[in-house]
């Protein structure tokens, strides 16, 4: 299993989903599911390719006077680090179907800005089916896309 990087707010929904992935990976005999959490405060830098798991904030509605609103500011800060951005290989988004058309929209934003595949989306903490589909999908993704550079870095 390749590395995951994720952000979870104080609601812990995304964190719980990542914990479910880890338990299911162990139960399958696949070993640990390495995951690094982007902190609420402070900085981290990664050193291995990863898939990002991110929640969508606020129904995507921007804060008055500020641009954005879909992607948590901690994730924006993390991805603004050139090294971290160079190692992202895909994105998985969490959200709430109450957001309507903006459900899991953070994944769409990050996929477009970082030029990486939008691999999956799930609601809130995800279901057992989501966990299985993500684990299966990540296995296939890393077989087909082993540690490649994102498209925007291939031509530099």
Curated annotation (Swiss-Prot):
The task this protein performs is described as: Probably involved in ribonucleotide reductase function.
User: What is a biological process (GO) this protein takes part in?
Assistant: protein modification process
User: What is the protein name stated in its UniProt record?
Assistant: Protein NrdI
By its UniProt entry, which Pfam families does this protein fall under?
Flavodoxin_NdrI (PF07972)
Molecular function terms, GO-annotated: FMN binding
Q: Which InterPro entries does the protein's record reference?
A: Flavoprotein-like_sf, RNR_Ib_NrdI_bac, RNR_NrdI
Looking up SUPFAM superfamilies in the UniProt record yields:
Flavoproteins (SSF52218)
Gene3D superfamilies according to UniProt = 3.40.50.360
Q: Which family does it belong to?
A: Belongs to the NrdI family.
Organism whose genome encodes this protein: Mycobacteroides abscessus (strain ATCC 19977 / DSM 44196 / CCUG 20993 / CIP 104536 / JCM 13569 / NCTC 13031 / TMC 1543 / L948) (Mycobacterium abscessus)
